[in-house]
Amino acid sequence: MAEVLDPQHPVARRLRPGERIQAYIPVAATDIVVTDQRVAISDEERLALDIEIAALRRIEFDIERDRPATLVIVPDHALDEPQVLAIPHDQLPAVAEALVYIGQQLYLEGLPG
């Protein structure tokens, strides 16, 4: 699932040393980027959201038969604006795989020890 971003991409410029990209999903004029540490939503110009996976409050993924799916990402902190994205049917597998990764990370972070 590891991907490579253009070095000029808004997310690429903020990656920490050793941080690995788990998913890069272009959706219309927006990109969804999931690393081993964070979730970011960006366009060519700016980051609309850039938060640690642990700072996620909720993710909703609604799939309908005849419409694009809706992905809602809600951060814990009110200062981070929730993101609502229309996901075309051809991107469902990539988004689902990214959500599985995020879910596993959230679970592992909640384990004692």
Stretches with model-predicted labels:
Residues 8, 22, 37, 83, ...:
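Residue-identity detector for glutamine
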Residues 90-113:
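Terminal and domain-flanking low-complexity segments
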Residues 21-68, 82:
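Phosphoinositide-binding peripheral membrane targeting modules
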Residues 59-60, 76, 112:
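Solvent-exposed, non-transmembrane amphipathic alpha-helical segments
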Residues 1-32:
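Anionic N-terminal interaction surfaces
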Residues 63, 75-77, 103-106:
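Generic hydrophobic/packing signal
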Residues 75-98:
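Canonical phosphoinositide-binding patch of PH/PH-like domains
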